[in-house]
C-alpha cells in the first residue's frame, strides 16, 4: 500500500504531541491576536462563542477556533482517493496549495491561549496552541495543511525575532496542571460558555 494511504505511514506527531509552546517577547494579547490573524489568512474565521471569556476567567488570554467541515472533507477525500490528485501529490508533495488542502480538513478545534512570563511585567508571554487533531481521511492532505499553517506561524515569529526560546512540542502527559487545555477542562469551559449564551 502506498504511504499516501497508509495509516501506519502517516505523520502522527500532531496526534502524539498536540501542544505547541512559544515563549515570545510579546504581551499575551499581542501573541493571541497574531496567532488568530495568522489562522485567518488561511480563511479560518470561526471562533467558539464565549470561550474568550471563559479563558479570561481562568487567568488566560485566549480563544478557540473551529476549523474544517466533516461533510466537505469526506467528499474531497473520496474524490482524491479515486483520482490522479493523490498520485500527483505523492510525487510532488508541495504541488497542492494550502487552499486546496484546506478542503480536506475535518472539523477540528484549535485552542490558542497565552499568559505573561513570570517577572516580565507582562511584556513577554508563553503562547500555547493546542490542535484537537482527529482524522478519518485516507489521504494525508489534512496533516499537510496543519503542518504548513503551524510551520508558517513559527517562521513568522522567527522572522520577527520575537521568539525567546525554541518551540516546544508537548504530549498530554507533559501538560502542566495549571494549563487549562486538558479534555475535561476544555469540556467544562465549553459547557460554561454555552450556558452563558442562553
Question: Model segments located where?
Answer:
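Ser/Thr-rich, low-complexity intrinsically disordered terminal regions
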Residues: 2-197
Amino acid at each position: 500500500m502506498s504511504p499516501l494511504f497508509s495509516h501506519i505511514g502517516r505523520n502522527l506527531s500532531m496526534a502524539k504531541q498536540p501542544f505547541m509552546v512559544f515563549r515570545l517577547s510579546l504581551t499575551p494579547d499581542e501573541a493571541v491576536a497574531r496567532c488568530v490573524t495568522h489562522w485567518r489568512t488561511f480563511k479560518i474565521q470561526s471562533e467558539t462563542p464565549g470561550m474568550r471569556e471563559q479563558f479570561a476567567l481562568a487567568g488566560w488570554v485566549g480563544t478557540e477556533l473551529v476549523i474544517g467541515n466533516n461533510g466537505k472533507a469526506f467528499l474531497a477525500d473520496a474524490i482524491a482517493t479515486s483520482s490522479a490528485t493523490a498520485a500527483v501529490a505523492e510525487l510532488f508533495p508541495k504541488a497542492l496549495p494550502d487552499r486546496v488542502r484546506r478542503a480536506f480538513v475535518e472539523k477540528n478545534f484549535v485552542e490558542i491561549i497565552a499568559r505573561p512570563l513570570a517577572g516580565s511585567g507582562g511584556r513577554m508571554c508563553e503562547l500555547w496552541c493546542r490542535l484537537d487533531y482527529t482524522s478519518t481521511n485516507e489521504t494525508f492532505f489534512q496533516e499537510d495543511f496543519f503542518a504548513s499553517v503551524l510551520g508558517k506561524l513559527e517562521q513568522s515569529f522567527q522572522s520577527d525575532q520575537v521568539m525567546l526560546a525554541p518551540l516546544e512540542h508537548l504530549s498530554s502527559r507533559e501538560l502542566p496542571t495549571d494549563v487549562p487545555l486538558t479534555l475535561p477542562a476544555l469540556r467544562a469551559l465549553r459547557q460554561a460558555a454555552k450556558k452563558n449564551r442562553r
